[in-house]
């Protein structure tokens, strides 16, 4: 039976749906959301908690690029001593995948229907797709400086979503970055509230960053790509995933709200 509190959206693209196996027996929908929210807007979380078998789940994102990033970033992730198995379901990817980038992601999907048991090789070594929906860009751009060496575009996007809806983020080798917002007021809020704030990278490095509105001749914009992508994601698709739309994380609206979710902090 499905875990309680799942919000059902319209039927989505299979490229947006991922399988999550090897979950702890006491996992809840809200816990799964906490693991995956940073990759993008979540449309649905379907938690299967069958009697006599280990729980597993299907997570559906709004954007297929977010699903690819979740597979790339969370397959093999250690969650309370359980090594998560994250991959595309067998029916979700394959020869018909978009632009030739989808076939690699579907390799290990056999476990999707079986509750996290067998299955093939898993998504950890799968190449990320190189094609996707057109990038969403905006003129409401800020330049960020003072980023720590391990700061990635996703760290920056997560930090700046405190101000509003981010549609693009990237970082450069010199410790600067650019962030584009959907709305002008969010850009203004970011400059006012996030300038000289403490930034933390995914590796735990911290630094106080400066945020200012990007001018037409900004020295940062258009430089070489992200440190993290160029160094460790050499097989990433040519169009940066960082360009996908991400909804605001604070200032009122929740990330994702299952009807009966029961929050539980994990340390």
Swiss-Prot record:
Q: Report biased composition (Gly residues) as residue ranges.
A: 93-127
Under the GO molecular function aspect, what terms does this record hold?
A: RNA binding
GO biological process terms on file: mRNA processing; RNA splicing
The record's InterPro entries line, in alphabetical order, gives: Nucleotide-bd_a/b_plait_sf, RBD_domain_sf, RRM_dom, RRT5_SRSF_SR, SRSF1_RRM1, SRSF1_RRM2
Q: Repeat as a keyword?
A: yes
Renumbered to this chain, the Basic residues biased-composition regions fall at: 224-267
Q: What is its main location?
A: cytoplasm
Which subcellular locations apply to this protein?
Cytoplasm; Nucleus speckle
RRM domain: residues covered? 16-91, 140-214
Role this protein plays: May play a role in preventing exon skipping, ensuring the accuracy of splicing and regulating alternative splicing.
Family, as annotated: Belongs to the splicing factor SR family.
Q: Protein name, please?
A: Serine/arginine-rich splicing factor 1
Q: Which organism is it from?
A: Xenopus tropicalis (Western clawed frog)
Question: Gene name?
Answer: srsf1
């Amino acid at each position: 039976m499905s875990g309680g509190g799942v919000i059902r959206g319209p039927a989505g693209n299979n490229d947006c749906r991922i399988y999550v196996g090897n979950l702890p027996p006491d996992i809840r929908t809200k816990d799964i959301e906490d693991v995956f929210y940073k990759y993008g807007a979540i449309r649905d979380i379907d938690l299967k908690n069958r009697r006599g078998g280990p729980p597993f789940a299907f997570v559906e994102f709004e954007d297929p690029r977010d699903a690819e990033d979740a597979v790339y970033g969370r397959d093999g992730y250690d969650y309370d001593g359980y090594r998560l198995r994250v991959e595309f379901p067998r029916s979700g990817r394959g020869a018909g995948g978009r632009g030739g980038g989808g076939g690699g992601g579907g390799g290990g999907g056999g476990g999707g229907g079986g509750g996290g048991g067998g299955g093939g090789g898993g998504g950890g070594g799968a190449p990320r797709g190189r094609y996707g929906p057109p990038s969403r860009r905006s003129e409401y751009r800020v330049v960020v400086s003072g980023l720590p060496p391990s700061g990635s575009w996703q760290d920056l996007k997560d930090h700046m979503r405190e101000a509003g809806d981010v549609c693009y983020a990237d970082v450069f080798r010199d410790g600067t970055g650019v962030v584009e917002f959907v709305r002008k007021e969010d850009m203004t809020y970011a400059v006012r509230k996030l300038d000289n704030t403490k930034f933390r990278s995914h590796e735990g490095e911290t630094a106080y960053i400066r945020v200012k509105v990007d001018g037409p001749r900004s020295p940062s914009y258009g430089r070489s790509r992200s440190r993290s992508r160029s160094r460790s994601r050499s097989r990433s698709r040519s169009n940066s995933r960082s360009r996908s739309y991400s909804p605001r994380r604070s200032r009122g609206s929740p990330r994702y709200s299952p009807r009966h979710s029961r929050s539980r902090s994990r340390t």
